[in-house]
Amino acid sequence: MQTAPLRRPADLSHLSAHEARLACRRGEITGSTAGLAPGHVQANLAVLPKELATDFLLFAQRNPKPCPIIGVSAPGERRIPELGEDLDIATDIPGYRVWRNGEMVEERRDVADLWRDDLVAFAIGCSFSFEAAMVEDGLPLRHVEMGVRVPMYRTNIPCRPAGPFGGPMVVSMRPLKPADAIRAVQITSRFPAVHGAPVHLGLPEAIGIRDLAKPDYGDPVRIGADEIPVFWACGVTPQSVIAASKPAFAITHAPGAMLITDRRNTEFAVI
């Protein structure tokens, strides 16, 4: 199922992070959140019953590249106070996916009516943060130029398992000229809490990707003859893991539709 197309009225383009969340809550923004609240960290989401929370936290600790945890809710709570004022996990993301027994059964605008007292929400760092640093350095982002979602692919790179959780890493791809790819490695290495440096450059078949024109998530992008594909670990990995591990119930964000936080990208830079 594809995420809804971006709907962003012109008067939303300069909203604060809090105002952008409220606009999502009101249904005024759907689809991708790329470019909203510039300078603020956006987060992927995974929500699981509390009996699975410890195992998932251990899974994330063992796999920090695809699953860098930046916030965890208390059981039943729809807020993660350290991530934002008046932040509601169940309503403030423009697209959610509902999973039952490893199957994605529904995509919806909010999950307030599905929330339970035993659910724990995990906010996971998102590559939109390091994309902002790449743009500031003058590096091109093809998916932004084309107005589409970044392409994402399941790979043959195994995640380290924990309890019932395991499965393949998902990566996002950005085509760059070789010199720009080297610079991208330098820039994104500063942001380990939001996936950090790439996990692979070139040769997509070496990590199990057969056709770059057919991403598993997101949208395909043009790749120039003088460019190479550069792959970063991706926060959609929990969705691949949920499909493989088949928990009875889970909620995630829809790919490209993120939780906009009050935290600044600069807070997550290490140098």
Swiss-Prot record:
Top-rank taxon: Bacteria
Family: Belongs to the D-glutamate cyclase family.
EC number(s) recorded for this UniProt protein: 4.2.1.-
Group of enzyme by EC: lyase
One Gene Ontology term of the molecular function aspect: lyase activity
SUPFAM superfamilies, alphabetized: PSTPO5379-like
Annotated disulfide bonds: none
Pfam families: D-Glu_cyclase (PF07286)
Alphabetical keyword list: Lyase
Protein name: Putative hydro-lyase Mnod_1097
Family annotation (PANTHER family): D-GLUTAMATE CYCLASE, MITOCHONDRIAL
